[in-house]
């Protein structure tokens, strides 16, 4: 592993779960029946642990990174959309016209759009676009590794640097977002490699494939797993990410690692972002305590993924857009959980009698 990457991972402190009891004691002393705010209490307690027991809890400023990259596997016919849509959507993000732009504005969340691996050379200069291209797309995973180990490590380090910059700007929470035509295919391949799942069980329509095309997509993923089997079986999670992933997926995995390094809460978006989280978790298990799955993707295989991760998404809205949209929405809940912890009165403060034991 790259020395710089190893030094970041070694510097990550696991979340102190021993603080959970103090967090719950505070929540139980607020003017409400115990547990009556449900998962908001769980969120608040986890945020307290991430903060190391420091109060008040803070989620803001919050920032979503929508990271874009192209995929060689697009040539295998696994998406109904042409590859140039990746580039077109990056320009749409930069101009403020996409779903993620609207939802970030609604949620009061900062948005940064990142070209990590788009085809077509540099974009025109734009104040809303971060241009740090690691490479121009990937090779087809159905024919060999998506990228070299060096390229993958550069993408991971790019993501780490994005988290470092967010922390330097005072952010307390970051969110993951993606854009890359065909990127449900490498994401599915990563789930199969990391979690031992079968492509036939978790492969879905992505951006709208018909049933026959989904069956073709399953076969493409099977070929990818077979041609890269020697890499996957060697057990190196970074090499597996290089073999089966994408540049934006690796960058988002680095963002997760960087968030943990700087003690930031990290809100994970949908199907592709959860693949990036899974890669980061395999590379450094301690990142898990900093991460929150924002929503249950409508991709058919996502339930199997969540079960394999033993995780519970926050929202169930049938979303399948990506871009970071679910993460932006979930930041409302993160903010609400922090405010409850910070601002609700205790029984003693309010002069309210507690329930009898």
UniProtKB/Swiss-Prot annotation:
EC number of the protein: 2.4.2.21
Keyword Transferase among record annotations: yes
Pathway membership, UniProt: Nucleoside biosynthesis; alpha-ribazole biosynthesis; alpha-ribazole from 5,6-dimethylbenzimidazole: step 1/2
Record's keyword annotation contains Transferase: yes
Coiled-coil region: none
Gene3D superfamilies per the UniProt record, alphabetical: 1.10.1610.10, 3.40.50.10210
Active-site residues annotated for this sequence: 323
InterPro entries per record: Nict_dMeBzImd_PRibTrfase, Nict_dMeBzImd_PRibTrfase_bact, Nict_dMeBzImd_PRibTrfase_N, Nict_dMeBzImd_PRibTrfase_sf
Classification via PANTHER family: NICOTINATE-NUCLEOTIDE--DIMETHYLBENZIMIDAZOLE PHOSPHORIBOSYLTRANSFERASE
The name this protein goes by in its record: Nicotinate-nucleotide--dimethylbenzimidazole phosphoribosyltransferase
Native source species: Nitratidesulfovibrio vulgaris (strain DP4) (Desulfovibrio vulgaris)
Designated gene of the protein: cobT
């Amino acid at each position: 592993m790259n020395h710089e990457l190893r030094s970041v991972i070694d510097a990550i402190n696991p979340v102190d779960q021993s603080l959970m009891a103090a967090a719950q004691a505070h929540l139980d002393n607020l003017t409400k029946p115990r547990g009556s705010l449900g998962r908001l209490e769980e969120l608040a307690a986890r945020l307290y642990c991430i903060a190391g027991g420091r109060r008040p809890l803070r989620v803001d400023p919050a920032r979503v990174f929508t990271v874009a990259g192209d995929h060689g596997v697009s040539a295998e016919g696994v998406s109904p959309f042409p590859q140039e849509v990746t580039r077109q959507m990056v320009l749409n993000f930069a101009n403020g016209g996409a779903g993620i732009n609207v939802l970030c504005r609604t949620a009061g969340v900062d948005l940064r759009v990142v070209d990590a691996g788009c085809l077509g050379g540099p974009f025109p200069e734009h104040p809303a676009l971060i241009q740090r291209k690691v490479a121009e797309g990937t090779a087809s995973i159905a024919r060999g590794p998506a990228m070299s180990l060096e390229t993958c490590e550069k993408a991971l380090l790019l993501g780490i640097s994005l988290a470092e910059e967010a922390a330097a700007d005072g952010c307390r929470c970051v969110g993951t977002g993606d854009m890359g035509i065909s990127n449900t295919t490498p994401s599915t391949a990563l789930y199969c490699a990391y979690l031992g799942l079968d492509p036939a069980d978790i492969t879905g329509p992505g951006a709208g494939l018909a049933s026959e095309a989904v069956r073709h997509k399953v076969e493409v993923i099977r070929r990818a797993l077979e041609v890269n089997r020697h890499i996957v079986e060697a057990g190196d999670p970074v090499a597996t990410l290089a073999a089966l992933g994408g540049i934006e997926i690796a960058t988002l995995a680095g963002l997760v690692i960087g968030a943990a390094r700087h003690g930031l809460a990290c809100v994970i978006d949908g199907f592709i972002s959860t693949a990036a989280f899974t890669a980061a978790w395999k590379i450094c298990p301690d990142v898990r305590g900093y991460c929150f799955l924002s929503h249950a993707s409508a991709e058919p295989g996502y339930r199997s993924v969540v079960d394999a991760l033993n995780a519970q998404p926050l929202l169930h809205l049938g979303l399948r857009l990506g871009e970071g949209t679910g993460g932006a929405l979930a930041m409302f809940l993160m903010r609400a959980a922090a405010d409850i912890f910070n601002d609700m009165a205790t029984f003693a403060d309010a002069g309210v009698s507690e329930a009898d034991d």
